[in-house]
Regions:
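Cleavable N-terminal export/targeting peptides
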Residues: 1-31
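Outer-membrane beta-barrel biogenesis signature
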Residues: 20-49, 53-69, 275-279, 317, ...
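Extracytoplasmic loops and strand-loop junctions of Gram-negative outer membrane beta-barrel proteins
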Residues: 28-31, 73-80, 151-155, 198-200, ...
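Outer membrane beta-barrel
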Residues: 37-66, 76-192, 209, 214-225, ...
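Outer-membrane beta-barrel proteins
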Residues: 57-61, 120, 145-149, 191-196, ...
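Detector for outer-membrane/organellar transmembrane beta-barrel domains
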Residues: 219-358, 362
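Outer-membrane beta-barrel "beta-signal"
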Residues: 403-419
Length: 419
């Protein structure tokens, strides 16, 4: 009961008490008058990260996507009409509370929402409690590098990026010299599977029975950090009414290097099998595994990476360049479906037997940003991506072996205001 009381105090009491506000604080920041070690026992903040998401689709078939998701490019589509849209659904509202116990240890609690839940509906982003060694709740998945994010206007990011938020139980600590941080977590398994248009394996969703296990080691220095992480998964699928499972695993290497002028270089490399649920351009599409001609389900191999560089021309004027790619493949598939039409002979929903399928998503952008005053950033960005597929097998009693690709271009713009 005492623990529940502490959580309630951390989240809500700071918003009800009258306290002193400080320069550079958020919309509402309050501190208790009682202190410990010259720090307030209780501190609370209410903040808003306002984001205007404007975009003009030049071509490529992503008119219905509010992010520049290369995985959603319809490679057999022909609609290259332009589209202009704006929204503020990516605006975030958060409440944060810090409570210092009598022994000097601090407890932090965060609740954060945005309006990206479909048609402007509110969506929970984060809700967690953190102590000196534990973090429990929903936050960034430990397989990804929480500190990384290229400074871009469109918030899908590179196709191989890992920016997944899941409920988890995480334990972390430091070695004696504090240069190395270790992290272990139990992550909620991902079970949202939606068939994508280009390929539709006859695999159904099944209840998961085990958490995803992650481990990470981070090396911190004044210039930035390097991080290595790994994941082990048990993924269950239902094939032809029968439940089966397989092991998935993956590894990432990531890091950031920054200078005193705030110029920075970021990168992330990823590879593994059965981890497509974590790759941003294909996450949630049920591509972790596929049925083979042997009647078994095999983990999907995939790999990718991205790099970004941000350069400050002046303290207020800066630019970013980002490149990234993702590659995954299905070998010796029992069957899959090509929707829309084949490149030469138009046939709707072609069933392909005993074949292979692979896809590459390539991504690049360049932007310029300006900060007219404190807490305000405006920018414009050119986004470009290519989705290519290779496929072969037997269709309509004939051998097919072909490939197709389609590119897309978007101009993103908007502002970010932190209140």
């Amino acid at each position: 009961m005492k623990k529940y009381y502490i959580i309630i105090v951390v989240l809500f009491l700071p918003l009800l008490m009258i306290g002193q506000t400080y320069e550079n604080d958020r919309l509402l920041t309050v501190r208790s008058k009682d202190s410990l070690n010259d720090k307030p026992r209780i501190k609370g903040a209410l903040g808003v990260n306002m984001k205007l998401n404007g975009y003009f689709d030049v071509y490529g078939g992503l008119q219905d996507s509010d992010t520049f998701n290369i995985g959603q490019i319809p490679v057999f589509g022909t609609d290259d009409s332009s589209s202009f849209k704006m929204d503020l659904y990516q605006t975030q509202i958060f409440i944060q509370g810090d409570y210092m116990q009598k022994n000097g240890e601090s407890i932090k609690a965060v609740v954060e929402f945005d309006f990206w839940g479909g048609n402007g509906h509110m969506r929970l982003r984060k809700a967690f409690v953190e102590t000196n060694h534990w973090q429990i709740g929903q936050n960034w998945n430990n397989f990804g590098d929480e500190a990384l994010w290229p400074n871009v206007m469109e918030w899908e990011g590179p196709p191989s990026g890992i920016w997944k938020r899941t409920p988890h139980i995480k334990y972390f600590g430091y070695f004696k010299n504090d240069l190395f941080k270790y992290e272990f977590s139990l992550e909620a398994p991902t079970i949202d599977f939606i068939a994508l248009g280009d390929i539709e394996p006859l695999v159904e969703e099944a209840n998961q029975v085990a958490p995803d296990l992650t481990a990470a080691l981070k090396y911190n220095k004044g210039w930035g950090h390097l991080r290595f992480s790994s994941i082990l998964r048990n993924v269950r699928y239902k094939l032809n009414g029968e439940t089966d499972d397989f092991l998935g695993y993956g590894f990432t290497v990531s890091g950031i290097y920054h200078t005193e002028r705030k110029n920075n270089f970021q990168f992330q490399l990823i590879g593994g099998k059965g981890i497509n649920a974590y790759l941003t351009s294909i996450a949630g599409l049920g591509y972790d595994g596929f049925p083979t001609i042997s009647g078994e389900i095999e983990a999907t191999p995939s790999y990718g990476g991205w790099v970004s560089y941000e350069y400050y021309f002046t303290p207020k004027f800066h630019s970013n360049v980002v490149f990234g790619f993702t590659h995954y493949k299905f070998d010796n598939m029992e069957r899959y479906i090509l929707t829309s039409e084949l490149p030469i002979d138009p046939i709707d929903d072609v069933l392909v037997l005993d074949g292979d399928f692979s896809s590459i998503h390539s991504y690049g952008l360049i932007n310029v940003m300006y900060e007219p005053f404190e807490r305000m950033t405006v920018g414009v960005e050119l986004d470009y991506g290519v989705k290519s597929i290779d496929f072969n097998g037997f269709a309509n009693n004939e051998v097919i072996d072909d490939s197709e690709e389609r590119d897309a271009m978007r101009i993103s713009f908007g502002f970010m205001f932190y209140l």
